[in-house]
Amino acid sequence: MPNADRHPASPRLDHCPEGLPKAAYFDAGWYGREMATIFARQWVMVGRAADFPSSRMRRVSVGAASVIVLRDAEGALAAYHNSCPHRGSELCLADEEDVGKLIRCPYHAFAYAARDGRLVSTAHAVPTPDFDPAAHGLRPVSLRVWNGFLFLNLSPAPGDIWADVGLAALDNWPMDGLVTAHHWESEIACNWKAFWEIYSECLHCPGIHPELCDMVPIYSKGVMGASEALGWTPDDPVRPNLRPGAESWTLDGAPCGPVFPGLTPAERAAGYSFVTLWPSAYVVAHVDYVRSVRIVPLGPERTRLVAEWHFAPETLAQPGFDAAKVADFAKIVMQQDGAASEMNHRGMASPSFTTARLMPEEYEIHRFHQWVLSEMEPAQ
């Protein structure tokens, strides 16, 4: 069927554009520019705010920066660069450490107030009058909580959190009250953008995801939604996303607990709602639980995936409830995506490869590529 059968309202591309150059996936200099622009300016998800315990500080990565996130004894969150303003030493040496009212540098014992980062003590050093303690506190990092998720931003003047479908998309889910009950991590040998690319199209679905195509039948056609198909019109009837009898992304399609009561009939019928939060995460809201996935760059050719499953307390209180079993379905899909991303990355290393040529169904990849290039422009 020729692309002329594409409806103007369809998201399909009307041409086959080139992708990013090969250097975008392998070159250390390109990667460094991404860290200095995209990941230094955008809000980066680092987990659920409720999962940061009181009187503890945790070391997290935001692009090229190491950041301390802490919650003090009174429950207040704060974030600072993990670098002592004195001579630059790391402050938090482990993934997580106890913290009281002070953060003390392990090198020269300079002490800083945990709540606001003020320099409190220079320990054995005796500064001269030209040293202003008020100008040498910890360097703060902006933080914001959205739907219970904690985001950090390295920019001195951060803008709003960006979400592809808007920040109100999950308003009918009880997001703030959800509890994290399962955690899964995987390191994959590919560039961080390669995983975003496989997330952004379904041409690969028929060959890579048999279980997912069974759960979401339209994926077996190589499209993410009906509007991508040639011949589609806005007058076509809206059909449920999930196979008959399925209500959620679980191995048997059955809800793992009570369906969230605030959802609209359309949200229940859809079975899932994706929220994309470039560059660091996406959230998938089902009728009975929510999954978050963070994409953490580790280098030009290495990426960490961090997935967590969040449930209502009444779901967790069910006798015999097993969050790991609920997570099994999505783990299958993510492992398949990870293996395919690695396969693609290895192939792109070929001397014969220079750049991709995107298909009309890969409109979301094209949009992502344009976003990456625009965000790498120097700040105005």
Annotate each language-model stretch with its function:
Residues 20, 24-63:
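Non-catalytic accessory segments flanking enzyme active sites
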Residues 40-51, 122-127, 274-279:
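Short Pro/Gly-enriched beta-strand edge/turn motifs at strand-loop
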Residues 46, 52, 91, 119, ...:
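Short clusters of hydrophobic/aromatic residues that line enzyme substrate/ligand-binding pockets
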Residues 39-43, 89, 204:
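Generic structural signal for secondary-structure transition and capping sites
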Residues 51-156, 164-165:
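Rieske [2Fe-2S] iron-sulfur-binding domain
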Residues 8-22, 176:
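Short, contiguous pre-domain boundary segments
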Residues 1-12, 377-380:
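Basic/polar N-terminal segments that are highly enriched at the extreme N-terminus
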Residues 71, 76, 82, 144, ...:
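C-terminal catalytic domain of Rieske-type non-heme iron oxygenases
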